[in-house]
Amino acid sequence: MNEEQLLKRKIIDTDNQAFNHNIYTYTNFLSINELSSVNKMSNELSFIPYDEWGGNPVCERKIIRFGSEELYGYDAGYPISTIRISPLSVKFAEQLNHRDYLGAIMNLGIERELVGDIIIKVPDAYVYCLSHIADYICDNLDSIKHTHIRCTICTDEIEAIKPELEEIRIIAASKRIDAVVASLTRLSRSNSNELFTSKKIFLNGICTENKSQNLKKDDVLVIRGHGKYIFIGDEAETRKGRSYLTLMQYK
């Protein structure tokens, strides 16, 4: 059984638990590619609704929750905690990167699927994780490389990592997704096409290699390594027949 088949089995089992026991059920954190695979499985799942959440709207790694308030009469939320990691002495702290933080956490014996996105806002970092391991991380993680740190579970919304939406306008050859991607990334059409073949383009949660489809209002476009956008629409044409397009970009 390959990894994709194993993932499908886990998803179907989690879906069936929600269906058979009338309770919310959750996956562990899934990568953006795994989430894409799940979003293609609608014909293999029960009628139980599901949604995704990673801690904030721009997270790539998310858990899936089966069930809804409409179905069960209550909202169980998501078992995700946010941990702030801060150096004990900012003056003597090293410049730590994503790999440093993730490596230190996994060295505690924690599996990757229990940890979501890590957002670095120097001098701090914020780690999304499943709630049942948050205390363990805080109790056991006291240094990263040569930097002594403290961990705190955040109970309120953190303004420092709250995403903002900014309206942007671009000029593209058309509303075709390849034209929009080329304009957003400032790459040539041929170079931007490599993003499709390397499976870095996601439209409404599904990895796509179809370069010819037109974007529609409220489509959510993710370009890995470049950003996340909501397509608003086209406004007018230039004298040369190119399109003015409006999108909202997560900052």
Describe the residue ranges of each PLM region.
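A basic, amphipathic helix-loop patch mediating RNA/tRNA/ribosome contacts
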Residues: 171-217
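Short histidine
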Residues: 219-220, 229
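Ferredoxin-like alpha/beta domains used as RNA- or RNAP-binding modules
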Residues: 1-184, 207, 228-251
